[in-house]
């Protein structure tokens, strides 16, 4: 086959084009935080889950899902200005034993140290077997009235403080941290939760006039 001059010109000047395959568009799917917790969760687990929610509506949803009286008790203690703690503010003095060594200092500092250790180790195991807690806020909340004004004013202050320390020592460190925070109305410094959120989640709570 003889190619003409025109054919040759076309062949030498026409650029070969290739079609590149289109890459499929990628979509980022936001991973939603599960609202499911173990049966009878510790209250620090509930409050931690509340903190992880980015919207007010989701925080309220978590509070409604895990609604129970002990949770309301600590939230009222913390957020109701008419609830006045009659325990000394700030650090809680403590003297105890660790193996054969005597430990002297403050309960708050001791618990904070344990909490930091748990975070650094990534170990939040629970239960009596691991020494992280022998009781819960759920069980002990019935005694909290003794620590507020008008609850049990006839109780000797030394006895009251001793009871408070005993409860703290029996709790999981993260639950003890909650109780100490509520005593001084500082729960909001640990967990992202406000009185407004609590009030919307639990409209049955009557605020004020409790002392």
Model-assigned labels for residue ranges:
Residues 2-211:
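N-terminal nucleic-acid-engaging modules of covalent nucleotidyltransferase systems
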